């Protein structure tokens, strides 16, 4: 049986009676909207400077920078969650959060296999690199990460819950890539 998302509950219990600063939607140099200065190490350092206690790395359709994020967060005393901002077949962006790096990587592999073979063109859409904790580039993702995977909102949510994760709709206040902009409503459940 997989570990559940109980790690969040433990963090909140320790923070009872005080304000807990968290950021659950962060992109790194892996996402084409990011740049090379946004390594997991640099992100964790900035989060620590700002007093953030809980953070989730949620690159587009991939978790390949989550291992470096885990190490960087441990160095700074930040409780990490490991995630993905998945793009569904309806073009909704959904945050998928996990307490374990391995589970986020597993979902990332499934998403990548379900994405169309639209290749990234770094000169036009930006780099998509994953790095180690020393900021050495380990590789570059070939497919363009900001495309829809062959997962419906309901199918993705079911899979994330099956893996012991947490599902959060992204961009709830935006006119694009949100549940309401794409579906016209927020589904039950």
Predicted regions and their residues:
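An N-terminally biased module of ancient metal coordination in phosphate/nucleic-acid-related enzymes
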Residues: 7, 12-90, 183-186
